[in-house]
């Protein structure tokens, strides 16, 4: 399923409790998207969230139902960083030089 990074800007600090988390999960399940990970800014007013979703529109539908912003939605891919590290160490040999 495609990956999307969502930037959300909030007027007040984000404080998610267990009930809020359950509501997010329920709506995400109904819409067919999966919240994978989030970063929260130091001032707790901005999040960057990684989602799997069939489309950008599915993310927007869930955001509207949850009454949360989805200011920027960017389709993203991944960079296999660990593969590069493994290749580097393999080329260096067991002594590390």
Predicted regions span which residues?
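An amphipathic, aromatic/His-enriched active-site/gating alpha helix that lines ligand/cofactor pockets
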Residues: 30, 53-79
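Short S/T/G/P-rich N-terminal loop/turn motif that feeds into the first structured element of a domain
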Residues: 1-30, 36, 45, 78-97
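Short, well-ordered beta-strand segments in beta-rich or mixed alpha/beta enzyme
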Residues: 4-8, 37-63
